[in-house]
Amino acid sequence: MFPGGRYFTVVCAFSHRNNDDPIMHSRHPGLSHNHTYAGNRSVDAFSTSASLRSGSTTCDFPQDASGYWAPTLYMGREPIQPMAVLVYYVKRTTADVVPFPADLEIVAGDATARKAQRKSIVSWGCDGFGGSKRYALIPACAKERTLDLRVQFPNCWNGKTSDSPDHKSHMAYSTGGKCPASHPVAVPTMLLILLYLPVPEAAQVVSGRFGAHADFMNGWDQDTFSTFVAGLNY
């Protein structure tokens, strides 16, 4: 049952859009496709975890100045702004979870995908969140429903590096509540959920109809985050 374990939730508003990506194209402004940001208000191509912590946030916890972003959803040439962004931090391992390293950067999902991604990682739905039917492509939601994009981040860390050349291989997904030997450190699963008003099926994210994904750059106050994460183990 969603979300699949003990959890705490951060609720964030839309912040801004730009053509930057401080993880994939660090220090190269304008090189990325358009991104929609929530959380930290100042994310750009030059952002780092340290710089984020000195900024402000759209999230309901002021101690969370992290950057959360995803490719912008478009209907034709019109960008569509999410109504809200939810971030579930969930314990999904049998081992206790520990906080992320202070400068962790993660990408989940594949911007270059040209076929359906695993729906356990990237999916769309019409119920906003929870156990609704999941789709590989944007569904035609009824007017009274809420379209959502859900991206699940990996929850096992190699314990050594806060990033990697592909921005993914320092992390892995658990299987049956167990982390692989290559990534033995259990951390919370992040479920990033972007909520939208229903859109026509012709709408798509700028990275392509199958290319939904999301990025995270840690900007938490580490003492606060450590306290929240410790609570997931009891």
Model-identified regions with their sequence ranges:
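Primary mode marks residue(s) on the alpha4-beta5-alpha5 output face of response regulator receiver
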Residues: M1-S32, T36-V151, N158-Y234
